[in-house]
Amino acid sequence: MQSQSKKFCAYALAGTAFAVMLGLSAPSLNAQSAPFAALAGSWSGAGRIDLQDGTSERIKCRASYSVGDGGLSFKQQLRCASDSYKFDVNSNIQSNGGSLSGTWSEATRNLTGKVSGNASASRIQARVDGGAFSAGLNVYTNGNQQGITIVPQGTEVKGVTVTMVKGQG
């Protein structure tokens, strides 16, 4: 049972990291004065979760964004499902002079954490922390598509890759 709980936490952290990264990719979509303005609306996509034992699972995700503070903050709701897990993540992200910070929660398992990072024109590098779990994150944005890579540390999850498209779903 402990292994199953640890595996769920790894998936939940990966999902949370993914949720945060969807939000953090906004600076490449819009000017620095309103980095999250282009996020408003719905996004959807699919990808893969790779496990340390060499197996993998497909994952599908849908996200919705409510942007505020003139494009400097947003609230996000993300729902993802693979063959083994479903999770529902909420995040609140702010931008302050190019530095990104925020919080996330996964309601079904009462998990919470923080995010921090930096952005350039088309690439985001960030870190998500939640208790005993952490993950490194990279996002590349091109138009209305986002490519996301997540590498959790200390879990059964080796990595997560997802492509999202705005306005579908």
Give the positions of each predicted feature.
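Localized chelating/binding microdomains
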Residues: C9, F18, P35
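Sec/Tat signal peptide C-region and signal peptidase I cleavage site
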Residues: S25-A31
